[in-house]
């Protein structure tokens, strides 16, 4: 989805928001111009999950694979943006697949964002990318209906524990209901107790008896060489 044509007015609110200041959020579809932000977000997620040794994604790789199909028919990315000024309420007619979610928040603590300059979609406006969710269709055969699988959901550290992360999961769930999707599912690292508690509070079931299985790298190539 292209950015809305009516941009919010520039403002002079300092990078550190005063206590009790209102903040505004928008969840929108990512576009090819957002690839640098998506790449940085995935890398920060790899650092948080202690999996940087597995991180090999490049901006060019993301650009060539993320936007080859219409939203919700293949890989889809939502970006969460934060601003001290209201976002425009007009909907971009060129992007009929999704209407951005707009919310207003009361921030109880100042937001110190040392990486802010790396996550500004528009240098003229005080809008910062705070998080993302990446998901795609799957097919729960027991339901005989399409599902959504969330591959990644991530909030940058300065914006955690402020209610923003809930918006990303809610946006996917609302879109699932709108499209008649049977279920939404994802995995969570077992040591991330805060995330597990958060998901359970959202009403999600956490299946402790299931295990993730994966073939990749040399193991995947070895399977290809088997005679069957």
Swiss-Prot record:
Q: Does the keyword Acyltransferase apply?
A: yes
Q: Which domain of life is it from?
A: Eukaryota
Protein name per its UniProtKB record: L-ornithine N5-acetyltransferase NATA1
Null mutant phenotype reads: No visible phenotype under normal growth conditions, but mutant plants are unable to produce N5-acetylornithine in response to methyl jasmonate.
Recount the UniProt induction comment for this entry.
By methyl jasmonate, and wounding by the aphid M.persicae, and the lepidopteran herbivores P.rapae (white cabbage butterfly) and P.xylostella (diamondback moth).
Q: What does this protein do?
A: Acetyltransferase that converts ornithine to N5-acetylornithine, which is likely used in plant defense.
Could you give a GO molecular-function term held by this entry?
N-acetyltransferase activity
Question: According to the UniProt record, where is the region Disordered?
Answer: 1-21
Matching entries from CDD domains are given as: NAT_SF
Record-listed E.C. numbers: 2.3.1.-
InterPro entries referenced in this protein's UniProt entry, alphabetically: Acyl_CoA_acyltransferase (IPR016181), Diverse_Substrate_AcTransf (IPR051016), GNAT_dom (IPR000182)
Q: Which PROSITE patterns match?
A: GNAT (PS51186)
GO annotation (BP), single: ornithine metabolic process
Q: Where does acetyl-CoA bind?
A: 153-155, 161-166, 192-195, 199
Q: Which organism is it from?
A: Arabidopsis thaliana
Q: What keywords were assigned to this record?
A: Acyltransferase, Plant defense, Transferase
Q: Indicate whether Metal-binding appears among the record's keywords.
A: no
Q: Where is the N-acetyltransferase domain?
A: 77-227
* Name of the top EC class for this enzyme: transferase
Which family, according to UniProt?
A: Belongs to the acetyltransferase family.
